[in-house]
Amino acid sequence: MSRYGLQQLYINGAYVDSTGDDTFDAVNPANGEIIAQLQSATVADVDRAVIAAAAGQKIWAAMTAMERSRILRRAVDILRERNDELALLETHDTGKPLSETRTVDIVTGADVLEYYAGLIPMLEGQQIPLRDTSFAYTRREPLGVVAGIGAWNYPIQIALWKSAPALAAGNAMIFKPSEVTSLTALKLAEVYTEAGLPAGVFNVLTGTGQSVGQALTTHPGIAKVSFTGGIASGKTVMANAAGSTLKDVTMELGGKSPLIVFEDADLDKAADIAMMANFFSSGQVCTNGTRVFVPQALQTQFEEKILARVQRIRIGNPTDEAVNFGPLVSFPHRESVLRYIESGKREGARVLVGGEPMTDEKYAQGAFVAPTVFTDCRDDMKIVREEIFGPVMSILTYQNEDEVIRRANDSEYGLAAGVVTGDLNRAHRVIHQLEAGICWINTWGESPAEMPVGGYKHSGVGRENGITTLEHYTQIKSVQVELGEFRSVF
């Protein structure tokens, strides 16, 4: 028997068996251990989840704002009480260091849920005077049943980012986690039920995007889809959503984000920021600043500072709390990252450090890739143009501000961007010209609940977090009231 056994689907407030027989394995990428088997949902399971969600949503939406708020706040308390337990499960499933999952994944996810729980009472309409005898008012009403489709890099955090505003607005959600990292989403469903969420309001269906994801995005009973993943999959989701019932969509589709270091920057700070923007979570962060632009005159100094910091990375067993760099999420993903590294070598980028799989006995059983820094990179290189989603930094040099802005924007992506400079006038001037939805000045990577997150161009549609996201899980109903006589022209 595997560590976590056989995992069922979660529908209508309880674990239930799939109507099909297919299962798949959850694998710990640190050592290759099969830690669980998960049932694959079928189209019939999607149908029954939609039925359960529609029934539960009516109960949930009929509650007062304060009642819904109290239930979600209880869920926040439970998440925080179980932080360490959930963090260990996330570490086993993703390979992320325990030092990270204990302090980031559940903590920040719970923060988002607490934020939206507090906003529920502010979901209100307007009263609009028209004339002495007539006025109009608006109501913000929930969409109904919505779907969330998660990515594998932040499983429980993404499940909370998607479910928190949806539930706060009075909707029910059917969530499909990535088949690579599904375990904590099921635990989140347990937490919601324990907190008092009505049955059917949060359901979890495990399985592949080709089967479960396809069924969710085309189902006529679903009003909106929130998706995190790649561009190709996002286009399929959008086409399915439009071709079925004109569903609303929110999508975060990754990035190849520029980090611009200016000549007046504190180079130690710039190097620290570049390290966090490339190697946190083993480089598996959508917003990573993987195109690092430095003035040509400072290239050697900057490389020396990066090289010194790479030596301080603590690689190892992710359950060791001293470790801050674990394996990649899966063995197939490791092979993908290694192919990109070989591409960089072939195209003439110089390897400053790393560039190899980690095959020592200590790492041989896991999906480890050494932290890698390429320098002397060109804009046309594959490693510079495509999202690698691994611990690979590309250093590029530039001559002047106009040039670096133009090159930073030369990408199909537009998720994030950042500048490091001592001149705040320049910082704002440059940021205002960068084509990216999330920008940082003299920092990198923080995504607080209050701040909308999303991309320009092919990096996505819509936003997550912030007040605007809550509003987009509602629809506005306008009502006109006539207090006087009605006069017909007929």
UniProtKB/Swiss-Prot annotation:
Active-site residues, Swiss-Prot/TrEMBL:
K162, E252, C286, E464
EC number(s) per UniProt? 1.2.1.8
Q: Where does K(+) 1 bind?
A: D93, V180
List UniProt keywords, sorted A-Z.
Metal-binding, NAD, NADP, Oxidation, Oxidoreductase, Potassium
Q: How is the cofactor bound?
A: Binds 2 potassium ions per subunit.
User: By its UniProt entry, which InterPro entries does this protein fall under?
Assistant: Ald_DH/histidinol_DH, Ald_DH_C, Ald_DH_CS_CYS, Ald_DH_CS_GLU, Ald_DH_N, Aldehyde_DH_dom, BADH
Carrying Cysteine sulfenic acid (-SOH), the residues are C286
Catalysed reaction equations from the record: betaine aldehyde + NAD(+) + H2O = glycine betaine + NADH + 2 H(+)
Query: Which positions does UniProt annotate for K(+) 2 binding?
Result: L246, K457, G460
Q: In which pathway does it act?
A: Amine and polyamine biosynthesis; betaine biosynthesis via choline pathway; betaine from betaine aldehyde: step 1/1
Any one GO BP annotation for this protein = glycine betaine biosynthetic process from choline
Give the binding site residues for NAD(+): G150, A151, W152, K176, P177, S178, E179, G230, I231, A232, S233, G254, C286, E387
**Which residues does the annotation list for site: Seems to be a necessary countercharge to the potassium cations?**
D248
Required co-factor?
A: K(+)
Q: Which GO terms describe its molecular function?
A: betaine-aldehyde dehydrogenase (NAD+) activity; metal ion binding
The lineage's top-level taxon is Bacteria
* Family under the similarity heading: Belongs to the aldehyde dehydrogenase family.
How does it associate, per the subunit comment?
A: Dimer of dimers.
Q: What does this protein do?
A: Involved in the biosynthesis of the osmoprotectant glycine betaine. Catalyzes the irreversible oxidation of betaine aldehyde to the corresponding acid.
Protein name, entry field? Betaine aldehyde dehydrogenase
